[in-house]
A protein has these predicted regions:
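M16/MPP (pitrilysin/insulinase) zinc-metallopeptidase core fold and M16-derived inactive scaffolds
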Residues: 1-38, 81, 219-220, 224-243
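Scaffold signal of the M16-like zinc-metallopeptidase fold and its non-catalytic homologs
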Residues: 4, 79-131, 149-153, 220, ...
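Helix N-cap motif at beta-to-alpha junctions
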Residues: 40-43, 139-143, 267-270
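An aromatic/glycine/proline-enriched structural segment found at the starts
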Residues: 97, 101, 105-113, 129, ...
Length: 284
């Protein structure tokens, strides 16, 4: 989006979005790259046109790529300063060893430094294909209208050499591997720990029950000043025994697997063992 397209300059693209009163952004997760727009009902067609133009006609100028490379390197530095992000990256690395889900979203620094324009264009040609993309609308948009917009703007997309059938995946399901990693830093003021078991996928019938279970176990943070009795029984135990500064339960789902667990921060170096004992005993 920062490079402009064959039909729109970067400035022209920004001005067009601003004049619509719209919001245009993109993000990458461990499984998807998403380009999205929020616009008024009357501007849905133009919003889809803009997204289509970005996906299919981006210029990828060398100077713009270098600017974005610097942005990503700075972003990576900021992520590495956030202990919670580092802990969850390590958790994914050991839970899904040797698999795509075990990699970080930004990737290693050497890849960011070495990626070239040819790498990007080859990736777009091989991955931005009709069988690997989905157009989704929510809110003030009619289904039939969105179908027509998809036909208008995306019908010319090629398909992969080995097309992916709707509702299937070309990859093996993620394999959860029980393991452990510890990173010691004697200068750190807190112990930051994540413990997880294999969770469920988005399409699992247990997806919503696992979210309910996450809510039952709850979250707690001493700095918020709320009474431990207002949350789960576990929060009362943690508060009374000074086991942690805070904890939160999480249920992270992917297309074919997931992680369910707890993340805790504590100034008490022995609290990990005690909190784990309460978790396994089912003290809610």
């Amino acid at each position: 989006m920062r490079t402009g397209t064959n039909n729109r300059t970067q400035h022209g693209l920004e001005l067009e979005v601003e004049n619509l009163g719209a919001h245009l952004n993109a993000y990458t997760s461990r499984e998807q790259t998403v380009f999205y727009a929020k616009a008024f009902r009357k501007d849905v067609g133009q919003a889809v046109d803009i997204i289509s133009d970005i996906l299919q006609n981006s210029k990828l100028d060398a100077s713009a790529i270098e600017r974005e490379r610097d942005v990503i390197l700075r972003e990576q530095e900021e992520v590495e300063k956030q202990v919670e992000e580092v802990v969850f990256d390590n958790l994914h690395e050991v839970a899904f060893q040797g698999q795509a889900l075990g990699r970080t979203i930004l990737g290693p620094k050497e890849n960011i430094l070495s990626i070239s324009r040819n790498d990007l264009t080859n990736y777009i040609k091989s991955k931005y294909t009709a069988d690997r993309m989905v157009l989704v609308g929510a809110g003030g948009v009619e289904h039939e209208e969105l179908v027509k917009l998809a036909e208008k703007h995306f019908s010319g997309l090629p398909v992969s050499q080995n097309p992916i059938q709707l509702g299937t995946s070309q990859y093996e399901p993620g394999r959860f591997i029980g393991s452990e990693v510890r990173v010691r830093d004697d200068t750190a003021s807190t112990c930051n720990v994540a413990i997880a078991v294999e969770g469920v996928s988005w399409k699992s019938p247990d997806y919503y029950p696992m979210l309910v279970l996450q809510s039952i176990f709850g979250n707690w943070d001493r700095s918020l000043g709320s009474s431990p009795l207002m949350s789960s029984r576990l929060s009362h135990i943690v508060s009374t025994n000074n086991l942690a500064n805070s904890f939160m339960h999480f249920s992270t789902s992917y297309s074919d697997t997931g992680l369910w667990g707890v993340y805790m921060v504590s100034e008490n170096p022995v609290s990990y063992t005690h909190l784990r004992a309460h978790e396994t005993r089912g003290n809610l």
